[in-house]
Amino acid sequence: MPRSVPDMSELLVKGVKHVYGRKMRKTRPTLPNVESPLVTHFHRWAGKRIRLSFLAAELGTREGQHILPDWNLRGNLFAGLLAAPMRWDRLGNLRVPKSFLMQTKARALEAPSDGKLVKIISVVEERGPGSSSYVPQSKAALQRAKQAMFVPVALQQSDMRYFSSEEIAVDKDTLLAEYSAQLISKVKEGLEVLLSMSGTSHERVELEDWDVVVTYDPDNANDIELRKCKGIPGDPVVIILNMGCLKCTELEELVNLRLRNHEYGLVLKVLKNERLLKFMYRLITFSR
């Protein structure tokens, strides 16, 4: 009777079991004790826009334990700028918080001339319908940029209405000048509101961490500084915004004389003056 050829796979399995015996047990890897919300709440992050969140639910507690430590981000100007929604930077070709970008929109000309149907304008506060284009908030960089960067992509690629480059008016110098004028107007308006609300223009305030000290010092080459104030109780870390680069006598009078409330300059609290401070930051960064 012919001998049957053994199945080599069965022999291999039996040999391995014989050699290793009880060591051939299935072992499950133990998961590390990870507290990062990127892992524990990954379903909330995956495929979504990542941004800083200051909601109480995010910074609060769960079962008596903090999900995230509180670094007083609500009172931090830079954290507030980073928390802005992300937009696509046409010039840099990457996604950036819109606090660091200048927005442009197209407006139909009431009286078209020379074949121009629409005009590209700068927008300080996002309002109204229509597609937008976002470019770096830097006057020096935008002066070297091509005019096409200011034109919303959807304006030229729309299936309903197509505009050729000859039909779109882009006056780059005028656009940048108007944007700067709008920011200066917003800053002046905010400072005038503070002046009307304050009982006395020289009411002194105490410095705390992440307060913003607004100065007007043309001799200081630093427009934005992060400074630790030694000698003051608590050694607070403050943000310095120097408006001296703007060369505006009205702002100089408001900051250095009429609204000065500390020996260092005009001290503003982020939570109370967030809108004004963001306009100041945008104006300084754009001017440089």
Swiss-Prot record:
| Compartment list | Mitochondrion
GO terms, biological process: mitochondrial genome maintenance
Pfam families per the UniProt record, alphabetical:
RRG8
Swiss-Prot/TrEMBL keywords: Mitochondrion
- For the keyword rRNA-binding, the answer is no
Q: GO CC: one term?
A: mitochondrion
User: What InterPro entries does this protein's entry cite?
Assistant: Rrg8 (IPR031415)
Q: Give the family from UniProt.
A: Belongs to the RRG8 family.
Q: What does this protein do?
A: Required for respiratory activity and maintenance and expression of the mitochondrial genome.
Protein's UniProt name: Required for respiratory growth protein 8, mitochondrial
Originating species? Eremothecium gossypii (strain ATCC 10895 / CBS 109.51 / FGSC 9923 / NRRL Y-1056)
For this protein's source organism, the top of the classification is:
Eukaryota, Fungi, Dikarya, Ascomycota, Saccharomycotina
